[in-house]
């Protein structure tokens, strides 16, 4: 079970965007995440007359390693570690600081 999922609110704990918050928009298989508004890079795009795309410089979100982000706990308003608790056949994620469920 992945500790971070699409739609989770995360906070960056290392790197150039340290301290910024965002929502996970994509989880990749190689342990990287794409977070809205984090790790923006400028990409030069060629115009494509076939599709009608205009050329120019575009800001694009680049992947961030999962080890550089932590789940944001809205109760404590801080980054928090995540654990997995097995209740019967169901796995649920919980915050390590207060034991409350993430998915509730």
From Swiss-Prot:
SUPFAM superfamilies membership: Translation proteins SH3-like domain
Keyword Metal-binding in annotation: no
CDD domains xrefs: KOW_RPL26 (cd06089)
Keywords assigned: Ribonucleoprotein, Ribosomal protein, RNA-binding, rRNA-binding
InterPro entries (alphabetical): KOW, Rib_uL2_dom2, Ribosomal_uL24, Ribosomal_uL24_CS, Ribosomal_uL24_KOW, Translation_prot_SH3-like_sf
Role of this protein: One of two assembly initiator proteins, it binds directly to the 5'-end of the 23S rRNA, where it nucleates assembly of the 50S subunit. One of the proteins that surrounds the polypeptide exit tunnel on the outside of the subunit.
Protein name: Large ribosomal subunit protein uL24
Record organism: Hydrogenovibrio crunogenus (strain DSM 25203 / XCL-2) (Thiomicrospira crunogena)
Taxonomic lineage from the root: Bacteria, Pseudomonadati, Pseudomonadota, Gammaproteobacteria, Thiotrichales
């Amino acid at each position: 079970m992945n500790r971070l999922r699409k739609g989770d609110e995360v906070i960056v704990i290392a790197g150039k965007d340290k301290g910024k918050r965002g929502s996970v928009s994509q989880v990749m298989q190689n342990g990287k995440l794409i977070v809205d508004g984090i790790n923006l890079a400028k990409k030069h795009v060629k115009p494509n007359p076939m599709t009608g795309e205009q050329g120019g410089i575009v800001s694009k979100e680049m992947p961030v390693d999962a080890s550089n982000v932590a789940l944001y706990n809205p109760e404590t308003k801080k980054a928090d570690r995540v654990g997995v608790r097995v209740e019967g056949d169901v796995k649920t994620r919980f915050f390590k600081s207060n034991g409350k469920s993430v998915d509730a």
